[in-house]
Amino acid sequence: MMFRTLDDANVQSKRVLVRVDLNVPMANGEVTDLTRIERIVPTIAELSRKGAKVILLAHFGRPKGVASDENSLKHVVKPLSKVLDHSVHFAEDCIGDKAKAAVDALKDGDVLLLENTRFHKGEEKNDPEFVQALAANGDLYVNDAFSAAHRAHASTEGLAHVLPAFAGRAMQAELEALEKGLGNPARPVVAIVGGAKVSTKLDLLSNLIEKVDALVIGGGMANTFLAAKGLDVGKSLCEHELASTAREIMAKAETTKCAIILPVDAVVGWHFAADTPHQTYGVDSVPGDAMILDAGELSTDLIASAIDDAATLVWNGPLGAFELRPFDTATVKVARHVAKRTKEGKLVSVGGGGDTVAALNHAGVADDFTYISTAGGAFLEWMEGKPLPGVDVLKK
């Protein structure tokens, strides 16, 4: 995929509207995780260094077109300034007189954060009038928010039709990593898909079995597939009503020559709680009163072996109830094996999705993967093979 980057833009003395992701976790008006802020620093710093007037656009929360203190981006100014090591101005609106006055006051190299775009209903409707009102304060548009690229909103897609549009460095890194993961990957490719429910990942599974050489199914999702094969999963989380769908996916995988890897043994417990008594059973002998809470040792060895044969790995979702020890064992063990193969230069590894990032951080290996995507919905839709409006408009 070819797309325009900052290398193609002349930004000196230009007003550059930069769409960023500042939808950061907050508690009592304080930012509790700086990851998303840290990701946008390279783009902002580069534009400022090159003499642009940097104007940041972002949403926060779901205010539905109504301004409120709790969803104001003013709370992000201080941590953003600190991480950026550069003063950040703030405007109390993203359009109109307040925004214009703040933009007009900027000198080359200055950074300005405009108020939450979602305080206006036109943002989520991609309303042409709202797009023009935003565009009035810019000469160029840079999108650095891959996490919002699956939404065709005014600040993520609309602006790219009315101003020269470029990908920021975080967006560029994400797109290049994803291209390595599924776009044009080194083969064989293995995908790990875990998490609780098959119902939320049907499109994902259907797309992957056409693109990967092996598909590892773990977490609560695996129980639905085991049940579909006629196995008793006891009191495990299981969507029995999707048994026929699971069988269809397995049948389709046979025609596309995609090997499906399911657990062969499971760690079961009798209560959904940390440190509850637990035991390992073959998946064909799970006690009727127990629930599967993690993949067993034979299963993790099987997954590790598939990873050893792979050149590329894409991971979305944990292999067990990783938030409850000791049911994090399979996820941690496999994650560390992926990290080891990646560090040895034998594997390109891409992971993404909320629970996945938390699980890989828990295993202490997030930094050892080739790339970790912090984009939840956009990463999933990319894995599902769906078009991303915010990306498509940046293509050359």
Curated annotation (Swiss-Prot):
PROSITE patterns, A to Z: PGLYCERATE_KINASE
One Pfam family hit: PGK
Primary location: cytoplasm
Binding, substrate: 21-23, 36, 59-62, 118, 151
Keyword rRNA processing: no
PANTHER family to which the protein is assigned, alphabetical: PHOSPHOGLYCERATE KINASE, PHOSPHOGLYCERATE KINASE 1, CHLOROPLASTIC-RELATED
Name this polypeptide is given: Phosphoglycerate kinase
